[in-house]
Swiss-Prot record:
Residues 216-258 are annotated as: Disordered. Belongs to the EF-Ts family. The keyword Cytoplasm applies. This is Elongation factor Ts. It comes from Synechococcus sp. (strain JA-2-3B'a(2-13)) (Cyanobacteria bacterium Yellowstone B-Prime).
Length: 258
């Protein structure tokens, strides 16, 4: 459904919600203004955009260690006052965001607009070089690549991830709900995700040798196999002696019988 820009602007002025949130509310409400306002209030998005420009310098740095101690997260989430920073709803939000980061192994940035230009260009070069686009016209290739890049960049962005506890909203919408609820600007500033052994090339060790070394024993040596010496080369058979030549009998040597 196509939504008139004037309708989006009017809804924004009435609710203080963001432009994209107003557009989505109108689309889901069939263009009905009152239903769209109710939709925004139910989502907790009304009034969030007005507070988003305020300076948020308070907040909390929280951590989360996943079961098994193999994944750890540190995240900084800011709010405007220390009063809200001590609020249990805010603390729960920060902890939920930390758990979200632990669950999202591809996430590297807070939002799409924080992704460096060189990363965007690299992703574009990868997509442009794929074989399935080789025979496509240039204008079609550009549209396909743009769509793929937008999808890929959202995979790298924390705020664009579906919330792990309610996949019907994104992390960004979760934050906006708390902005409306707590009455202050809230923003995820930065985070770091640790994975045990990440980036380390593990040396392969012979398990039997390692156990023997820990026990102070020498690893058993493989039994030596005696090599059979090669047989001497066979001597060639002696050539047969040449046959003796028979001498012709002398004439007149035989006696005649009388």
């Amino acid at each position: 459904m196509s939504i008139d820009a004037k309708l989006v602007k009017e809804l924004r002025e009435k609710t203080g919600a963001g432009m994209m949130d107003c557009k989505k509310a109108l689309e889901d409400s069939g263009g009905d203004m009152e239903k769209a306002i109710t939709w925004l209030r139910q989502k907790g998005l009304a009034g969030a955009a007005k507070k988003a420009s305020r300076v948020a310098a308070e907040g909390a740095v929280d951590s989360y260690i996943h079961f098994g101690n193999r994944i750890g997260v540190l995240v900084e989430v800011n709010c405007e006052t220390d009063f809200v920073a001590r609020n249990e709803d805010f603390k729960k939000l920060v902890q939920d965001i930390a758990k979200q980061i632990a669950a999202c192994q591809n996430v590297e940035y807070v939002s799409v607009d924080q992704i460096p230009a060189e990363v965007v260009e690299r992703e574009k070069a990868i997509e442009m070089g794929k074989e399935d686009l080789a025979n496509k016209p240039e204008n079609i290739r550009e549209k396909i690549v743009q769509g793929r890049i937008e999808k890929r960049l959202k995979e790298l962005s924390l705020l664009d991830q579906p919330f792990i506890k309610d996949s019907s909203i994104t992390v960004e919408e979760l934050v906006k709900q708390h902005i409306a609820k707590l009455g202050e600007n809230i923003r995820v500033r930065r985070f770091v995700r640790f994975v045990l052994g990440e980036g380390i090339e593990k040396e392969e060790v012979d398990f039997a040798a390692e156990v023997a070394a820990q026990a102070g024993l020498k690893p058993a040596e493989a039994p030596k196999v005696e090599e059979t010496p090669p047989a001497p080369p066979e001597e060639p058979a002696p050539e047969p002696a040449p046959a003796a030549e028979s001498k012709p009998a002398k004439k007149g040597s035989a006696k005649k019988k009388k």
